[in-house]
Design a protein with these regions (language model features):
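Conserved RNA-binding domains used in RNP assembly and mRNA/RNA metabolism
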Residues: 2-105
Length: 105
């Protein structure tokens, strides 16, 4: 993998992030804490991402549901996250209009 000058991160990480600018993402900093917001910009020096309309999220896992689920949110507006502190980034997909119609009807 080609390495970039910014902290030794592969350039493919930046390409993946840049392709998702404008989409809603969940950046997980540790197993129980992260931020959910709209990816607005990607920086290479320092390596990081800017999120807008951001919520700080607390996640919990149980024996019955081992994949952590968001259990609480708190408004945080805009935030910069250094990529060195992020464990995982998930791109969140929009809800299907069919599911939304069934839920509201």
């Amino acid at each position: 993998m080609p390495m970039s000058e910014s902290g030794g991160l592969p350039t493919t990480v930046f390409h993946m992030l840049e392709k998702n600018v404008g989409r809603k993402v969940l950046a997980i900093l540790d197993p129980s804490y992260g931020f959910e917001g709209t990816l607005m910009a990607v920086t290479r020096d320092p390596p990081g991402i800017w999120l807008s309309n951001t919520d700080a999220v607390i996640m919990r896992a149980t024996i019955a549901q081992p994949i952590p689920q968001v259990v609480a949110k708190e408004d945080r507006s805009e935030i910069f996250l250094n990529l060195k502190n992020i464990h995982r980034i998930e791109v969140l997909h929009k809800k299907s209009p069919i599911l939304t119609q069934k839920d509201s009807g």
